[in-house]
Amino acid sequence: MQVLHVCSEMFPLLKTGGLADVIGALPAAQIADGVDARVLLPAFPDIRRGVTDAQVVSRRDTFAGHITLLFGHYNGVGIYLIDAPHLYDRPGSPYHDTNLFAYTDNVLRFALLGWVGAEMASGLDPFWRPDVVHAHDWHAGLAPAYLAARGRPAKSVFTVHNLAYQGMFYAHHMNDIQLPWSFFNIHGLEFNGQISFLKAGLYYADHITAVSPTYAREITEPQFAYGMEGLLQQRHREGRLSGVLNGVDEKIWSPETDLLLASRYTRDTLEDKAENKRQLQIAMGLKVDDKVPLFAVVSRLTSQKGLDLVLEALPGLLEQGGQLALLGAGDPVLQEGFLAAAAEYPGQVGVQIGYHEAFSHRIMGGADVILVPSRFEPCGLTQLYGLKYGTLPLVRRTGGLADTVSDCSLENLADGVASGFVFEDNNAWSLLRAIRRAFVLWSRPSLWRFVQRQAMAMDFSWQVAAKSYRELYYRLK
């Protein structure tokens, strides 16, 4: 079984979000599971530099100009690169310029990505062609449409990592992207009078997956579907929509082997976690005290992530004696709010604006509770890292958070399935009730340790996801 992942970023070469983590880990897990998985990416500068052994496979003149298809390897995974400097050789973000304006030629830059994905199924590389083209998010959404236009030379899977980003472009660009105008239709890629790359993926793919079972269910509901609910309800009825939970890359995220931690530990040596907490308290300017629970946030600071709720609930958390360490950037109003809290509560609140991958590991190793109060969360990786590190996740019951964290209710504790704290309602009061439960459990150290050990024993390895995808691919054949 030969599978081509079509996407725009891959950890650690280029990362703007969780999509990169998935592409950095899933193909390798699939190869270990017996699937011949390869990845197709635009040759953005950071990616081009990382794939050092790239050789020319093919050269083509396309609707988006001249391109060279390269093939090389990264960490044992075969990587195809679309080398088109006039489109991709730009510094910084792959999607927008330094002023945060989307590039005006994004329609061509990402239509080309989908086009090459479909061409691969028609023999662009004479020595390897995919049985399944697996496209990820709107950037690759046209791949299933180009396959449909070519009579479907391969099966297609489209994975939704976040339905909020829809890849919308003016209708007149149908003239530029080499798809029949008949595709510009409500039964096609048209959405609100524009081209939607996301809808192209949803409409033309043989199967749609979302990155968790709960998110797959939620996106059939109006409040999560951004106008796509009709199509997604239909795909659900046809059995063409399912959820496959993302995994954790254990080569990168494991407290037993994580060289970024001051002290490594396992579920049997949890006492060694304490040194990480001490170091984190020092680094964040917090009072060094192992008796108080240290809550943490590692997140984009946006209302989608529910960080306004944390700001509102913060006085209640601090009154009970807790500490907060925050790493993130985003909404200027939220940034100012957290910086003001750090100034008002020195020694209790530590804030670092920005994102540093290495420091996120130190927070995960040192904190007692990781807060993920998202309004919606397709899968969420932060809570999975928390479970892995014995840093109990406190989450809102939505998307992948609902699938992965079980509340420390009395019955869950009795049944041995408790792994964190879960709240229902989208408000600070509901969040504060969960924070209160965390303090109550904290006051019973042996019970806290019991829940940590349960959390760390859970299996969210990529092998599980790789097996689910393999079964899906074979069902499509």
UniProtKB/Swiss-Prot annotation:
InterPro entries: Glyco_trans_1, GS/SS, Starch_synth_cat_dom
Enzyme class name: transferase
Assigned EC number: 2.4.1.21
Protein name stated in the entry: Glycogen synthase
Reactions catalysed: [(1->4)-alpha-D-glucosyl](n) + ADP-alpha-D-glucose = [(1->4)-alpha-D-glucosyl](n+1) + ADP + H(+)
Family: Belongs to the glycosyltransferase 1 family. Bacterial/plant glycogen synthase subfamily.
Organism: Shigella sonnei (strain Ss046)
List of residues binding ADP-alpha-D-glucose: K15
Function: Synthesizes alpha-1,4-glucan chains using ADP-glucose.
